[in-house]
Curated annotation (Swiss-Prot):
Enzyme class per UniProt: hydrolase
This protein's record includes keyword Amino-acid biosynthesis: yes
Keywords: Amino-acid biosynthesis, Arginine biosynthesis, Hydrolase
GO molecular function, a single term: DNA-directed RNA polymerase activity
Top-rank taxon: Bacteria
Protein name: Putative acetylornithine deacetylase
Species for this entry: Leptospira biflexa
Biological or metabolic pathway of the protein: Amino-acid biosynthesis; L-arginine biosynthesis; L-ornithine from N(2)-acetyl-L-ornithine (linear): step 1/1
Enzyme Commission identifier(s): 3.5.1.16
Length: 277
């Protein structure tokens, strides 16, 4: 099992390049000094990890530790969790930590509200290998754009790009959005608008915030483009029963109907499905 870091509250610089291929064993342990990690394979050398003064140790002599295990008390560094365990583990950790703060005060919040914020914090990817894509190494791109570009290149038989997920703070996540209207309304308005003007950016108004600023309908519910031209048909006896009988497809049809017309034959006369006049 390969990994480049061990989880410690403050990681010493010499441990950041450590690579361990299997489980490690805590052999020698002395409080307030250090503990030695001995890999099971002979390829790796012994590593001494300093113990921060005043920290409670979570392992004992002879214990086996593996990738991502916490060696002393304290909070995890979110960047270490992202590098070692991946974005899914970091997502769960951040949601859990935020919920713990609210629950201690007797406040109950649905996870989905926090998950929306965390998702925006983990939406960017740093390009490590551009492959045959249009990206540049060390470029920070949106995760969805990254996947879309890789799919296009793979269909053409090219080499996809490689990237590393990055954790952004709330401020940076808000300023790095694709919409410059949304970014300018948050912070650094002059800088954001000047940068957008110099680069000739185009805002496609895909999100909620930018549409509210402009005064357009938000792209949600009946505000979505595919629902804007629909006319609601007149409710008549049997309409709901027929709609449920066909699995609700009638009310989700994206055609324009006349009031009182049949969803199947679009006539105002006898319905072909129900024999109704």
């Amino acid at each position: 099992m390969n990994f480049s870091k061990l989880v410690v509250r403050k990681m010493p610089a010499h441990l950041q390049k450590l690579t361990v291929k299997s489980k490690t064993k805590v052999k020698s342990l002395k409080k307030n000094e250090y503990y030695t990690i001995i890999p099971e394979t002979a390829e790796q050398e012994k590593v001494k990890v300093a113990i921060p003064i005043g920290k409670q140790i979570r392992v004992r002599q002879g214990d086996f530790v593996k990738r991502g295990d916490q060696l002393d008390e304290g909070n995890f560094d979110p960047h270490d969790i992202l590098a070692i365990k991946g974005p899914n583990a970091l997502h769960e950790y951040l949601v859990s930590e935020v919920q713990e703060v609210y629950r201690l005060q007797g406040v109950h919040i649905n996870d989905k509200h926090i998950e929306v914020v965390v998702r925006s914090m983990l939406r960017k990817v740093i390009i490590t290998d551009s492959g045959d894509t249009s990206f540049v190494n060390q470029q920070q791109v949106d995760k969805f754009l990254f996947d879309e570009e890789n799919d296009r290149v793979e269909k053409e038989g090219g080499s996809p790009a490689q990237g590393t997920p990055v954790l952004l703070g709330l401020t940076k996540a808000s300023l790095n959005t694709e919409s410059y209207f949304s970014a300018a309304s948050f912070q650094e308005t002059t800088k954001v608008l000047t940068d957008a003007a110099i680069k000739g950016k185009t805002d496609n108004l895909m999100g909620l915030k930018e549409n509210v600023i402009i005064g357009h309908m938000i792209p949600a519910g009946t505000g979505m483009k595919k629902y804007r031209d629909i006319e609601v048909f007149k409710d008549l006896p049997g309409d709901l029963d027929w709609d449920l009988a066909i699995g609700g497809r009638g009310r989700r049809s994206f055609r324009t109907f006349r009031v009182g017309s049949c969803f199947h034959c679009h006539t105002l006369s006898t319905c072909c499905r129900r024999g109704r006049g």
